[in-house]
């Protein structure tokens, strides 16, 4: 699934929404664990990479690196 390519600062949608009602998350840290921040209430959650890949629904916005 090429749709599930994700990177730092991408906005992603998870299978289940956050309790605040928002379902868009920003990836703020990548490694063995992924830290994502809710776009609705700014709460951050750290999830193991394997669990994140399983719960990821789709990438909403890809972060573009500025070209100089």
From Swiss-Prot:
Protein origin, superkingdom: Bacteria
Record-linked InterPro entries: DUF951 (IPR009296)
Pfam families: DUF951 (PF06107)
Protein name: Uncharacterized protein YyzM
Species classification: Bacteria, Bacillati, Bacillota, Bacilli, Bacillales
Gene behind this protein: yyzM
């Amino acid at each position: 699934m090429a749709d599930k390519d994700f990177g730092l600062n991408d906005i992603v949608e998870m299978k289940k929404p956050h309790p605040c009602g928002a379902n868009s998350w920003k990836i703020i840290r990548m490694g063995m664990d992924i830290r994502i921040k809710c776009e609705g209430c700014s709460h951050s959650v750290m999830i193991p990479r394997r669990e994140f890949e399983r719960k990821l629904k789709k990438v909403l916005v890809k972060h573009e690196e500025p070209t100089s």
